[in-house]
Amino acid sequence: MLSSNVPARKLPELAGSRPNGVVVDPNNLTPFLRMEGPRMRIVDGQFSPTPRRDFLKVSGASLSAAAVSGLAQAAQTTTEQKLPSIQVGPHRISRLVVGWNPIGGHSHTTWTMAQFMRQYFTLDRVVEFLRKCESEGITAWQFDHTDIGVGAIQRLRELGTNMKFICLHAERAIDAPIKKVIDDTGCIAIVHHGGVTDALFRAGQHQKVHDFVKKVHDHGVLAGVSAHNPDNIKRIADEGWEVDLFMCCFYYVTRPREEQLEKLGKVAVYEPYYESDPDEMTAVMRQVSQPCLGFKILAAGRLAWTQKQVELCFRRAFERIKPTDGVIVGMFPVYFDEVAADAAYTRQYGQIA
């Protein structure tokens, strides 16, 4: 049963203070909940917006007492525990990989949230955030080759880290050459960007993706392909490309307008997220032999209104994928310790028998 009077738990913060909210009576939330709905919560007696992206991830009114207790216990023990891990080439990485999108300001929701993410994640905060991830047992980061991505990796190495780095890249005209990516970051793998993959396959230019994979291998690192369309992952596997890993989006968000009209008779506003998408992608993930990293398991925050939702998404993700697969999850821990919570869910549901 969900508790209606659980006080907000004080959680560790990254550098910088959370924005001040309006001081309210935690026992009289009715006018505020009526005004703002479930996107707000009380933190230390203050009224604050609570997004994962711009969506509610946790509220005192929606967490059960048992869940709060469990997360608190997990936070105390995580430094002594390791996360379940998988093999990617010669490297062992945690089944939970921290994602890039919040750091890069890719909110998949609103321009305002994108700006908030970019402004929040300064270089210092990114480094502190990644060190927090590593302390919770997360040993891999999927990043983009940008100034802040490169700077964070170089700073982490100066401070000392065992974290592995996986770069999402495409070597378009706007992108750095593959050699520079490797020289700058020492990444263990470079994965072809999923949005570009889907566009090239749709245009009949899938050979460009295959050539990218070969070129990455020529530079001596693992090569992967990301996609949102499960048919593209299946085709690559069926054709026997020399791919070391896949990144597989749980939602076919690049589904083109004409395909939506043909199959559904209607078109979603902005990105389409459909309930059946995870089943379709994970069915393909189970069929391919390579390790797969599933991403957008929370539908870019659309399934993160409560911790019960988040926990369910983690459980279902690990139930659907192979034991040799993992998940990539972006985190925005401004108001809630998402790192500790997500690590706890991975320990609970991602154990490999």
Identify the residue ranges that each predicted region occupies.
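N-terminal secretory signal peptides
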Residues: 1-50
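Structured C-terminal cap/extension of enzyme domains
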Residues: 56-67, 86-95, 126-128, 157-159, ...
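Conserved, mostly hydrophobic/aromatic
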Residues: 98, 223, 292
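Active-site-adjacent beta->alpha loops and helix N-cap segments on the catalytic face
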Residues: 146-156, 174, 198-211
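Glycine-enriched alpha-helix->loop->beta-strand junction motifs that scaffold or abut catalytic
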Residues: 184-188, 238-247, 289-290, 321-324
